[in-house]
Amino acid sequence: MNGDRLREHLITLHGCRVVLRPMGESDWDVLARWNSDAEVLWYSEGDDVTSRLLEDVQGIYREVSQTGFCFIIEVGGQPIGECWLQKMNLDRVLTRYPGKDCRRIDLMIGEKHMWGQGYGSDTISVLTRFGFENEGVDLIFACGVADYNPRSRRAFEKIGYTVDQCIENQPGTKARYEYDLILSIGDYLKQKNAERDQVAGEAGRAADGSR
């Protein structure tokens, strides 16, 4: 695999409100802008970085793309963020779940005026469905969700993710605690069945009421 370029794909995913299109080599301008915004990076990164050089931005996404699917998040045809579904790369997770196909979801809403409107949770839902229903994975994680970013944690919990482990950092670090959240294929299917039963029940009650 060539780490000098993005490993591109042809997959486009549709959510209720977002479209996830393939990330490409033509997206560096917008990716560089988001990765130069100190407020965006405060929430999306675990360290104290406030800006990144273009070559660093390119290196990050190109590396991730070798073992994952990288997407640009769009709303109404306009890019608002990025995300990926990647093969797990953290030993602390892999040692807990040996022999399992573990993936991780990471995302950034780079357009700050779009924060708090549900686009993050819709993106997570789309990637989760893709991971379980198309990739056939066993477990999907959100890794290192910081205590100062409760909005991100709530977005994953809204889709059914729960805390798998809490990591306590050294005093004085940016995040005192970080959380790994998990969703298994079994729990995902239970949710899908429950949603299907609820829809069927509501349809049945509506039919009874029309008689």
Positions of the model-derived regions?
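Short N-terminal amphipathic alpha-helices
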Residues: V30, W42-S44, F71
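Acyl-donor (CoA/ACP) binding surface of acyl/acetyltransferases
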Residues: N2-W28, S36, C70, E74-R211
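An amphipathic alpha-helix signature
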Residues: E25-A32, L54, Q58
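Short loop/turn motifs at secondary-structure junctions and domain boundaries
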Residues: Y61-Q66
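Conserved GNAT-fold acetyl-CoA-binding loop/helix
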Residues: E39-I60
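Short acidic (Asp/Glu) patches
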Residues: D56, T67, M88
